[in-house]
Amino acid sequence: LVARTMTQAERWLERHHDEQFFLYVDTWDPHEPWDAPDYYTAAYREGYAGEQIYPAYGNYKQAGLHRDDVDLGHATYCGEVTMVDFWIGRLLAKLDALGLRENTLVFFTSDHGFYFGEHDYFGKAEWVHDAWAIVAEGSRMPSWLPESWLLTVGWSPLYGEITRIPLMVRGLGLEPGRRTALTTVPDLTPTILELAGIEAPASVQGDSFFGVLTGERDEQRSFVVSSWPLYFAEGEITLAVDSRPRHISSYMPLTVSTRDRSLILGGPDDEPEFYDLVGVPGEQDNIWESQTREGLKLARQALSFLEEQGTPQEHVRPRRMSLERFAAGNARGNSDRTERPQQWVDKEAG
């Protein structure tokens, strides 16, 4: 798909290169299925001629897969990424050939990452499957994957492997280098508009990180919020992916990230997960019970941010209920506050 998409993008540029333009190109790849030609994947799994491995979309061990299955999937994914890299290079070369390098801004980013065994996940979400599903002959892709409405969407935490995405910017006057400021996808639009000399409409959310790109400042945000749609709640039905109805079996969590901490908030029955990204990298050691006060502070900031963006209370309330419940046994143990935890959260979370 990426080959056809980039070829069409090149042709579009040939027709419109002498005009002012905004071109958005969605490669789709490296989305699964990872079926790049063998010459792309050979560097990562030389000589493999077996079946294609499809993500388990959940705990790969519980799905009956082994570590080598995940590694095979990762190899074909890497082949897909290499293919995408080649075709993006073609598009950039076309810009150069048309004389557009010096007056064209290029932004490269993605929507999310993928789990390849981290936290025992293989996929990007927890899909709770029909226990009686039959595996399709000659493939590890279950036959119900494209067919069964019995599929349900379960608890799917957004760890760093999902939330950290690439962002590369090329443009006239921007010096090569790396930036470590925290940004989020809504910041892209106002940044592009500012770089193009266009005033952002009042309806545009997000904040421009133009100053970060030019080196005028080092910071953008103190924290960022990543989430599934907050209306993905227990008992709801989603038609996402292919318009087939699928049940949602739990509140979909959101993740609050700073430079050195991450916090995962779910529904009323879900205990928060709080991680020290510096002391124990990889989000493996939940410190919520020992650092509840710090976790609550970050949670209050995140919930206030959601409210400022106009998030309906019906979507904020379940997260606050989780804090009220799971702070009860911990907040006084690691803080000098004396109020009841529920009062504390209600008062300071807005």
Model-derived segments and their meaning:
Residues L1-G350:
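Catalytic domains that recognize anionic headgroups
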